[in-house]
Structures are given as structure tokens and as C-alpha cells.
């Protein structure tokens, strides 16, 4: 998801999206620990997406 798509959302939508992405990050980290994750780069991409969402939330305040 690009930043332009993220900044169009409301703060409530962003908070819900942030919570969803953090849960997904947690599950990906667990899969990495148990050697079930085929592509570890997914974690890096997800962290960047979480950072974009946090930036959009901070910018809207």
C-alpha cells in the first residue's frame, strides 16, 4: 500500500489498519522462528508499511 493511499484514510481507519498489520507482523515473526516462513523479506516490507501508517497518523494530528 502506497503512502498516497494511506493518507486518504481517516484516523480511525488507520488505527484499525495499524492494529491489523501489527498482528500480521507478530504471526510472521512466529513463523520465522519456527522456520515456516518462506520469504523473510515479508517482515521488512510489513515493518515499512507500519511505519508509513504511523507517519500518516502523526501527520494528521
Curated annotation (Swiss-Prot):
Keywords assigned: Ribonucleoprotein, Ribosomal protein
MF term (GO), any: structural constituent of ribosome
Gene giving rise to this polypeptide: rpmC
GO CC entries: ribonucleoprotein complex; ribosome
Protein name per UniProt: Large ribosomal subunit protein uL29
Domain of life: Bacteria
Source organism of the structure: Campylobacter curvus (strain 525.92)
Pfam families in the record: Ribosomal_L29
Any GO BP annotation: translation
NCBIfam families reported in the protein's UniProt record: L29
Entries under InterPro entries matching the protein: Ribosomal_uL29, Ribosomal_uL29_CS, Ribosomal_uL29_sf
Amino acid at each position: 500500500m502506497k503512502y498516497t493511499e494511506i493518507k486518504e484514510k481517516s484516523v480511525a481507519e488507520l488505527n484499525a489498519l495499524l492494529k491489523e498489520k501489527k498482528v500480521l507482523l507478530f504471526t510472521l515473526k512466529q513463523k520465522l522462528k519456527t522456520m515456516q516462513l518462506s520469504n523473510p523479506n515479508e517482515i521488512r516490507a510489513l515493518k515499512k508499511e507500519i511505519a508509513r501508517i504511523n507517519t500518516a497518523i502523526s501527520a494528521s494530528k
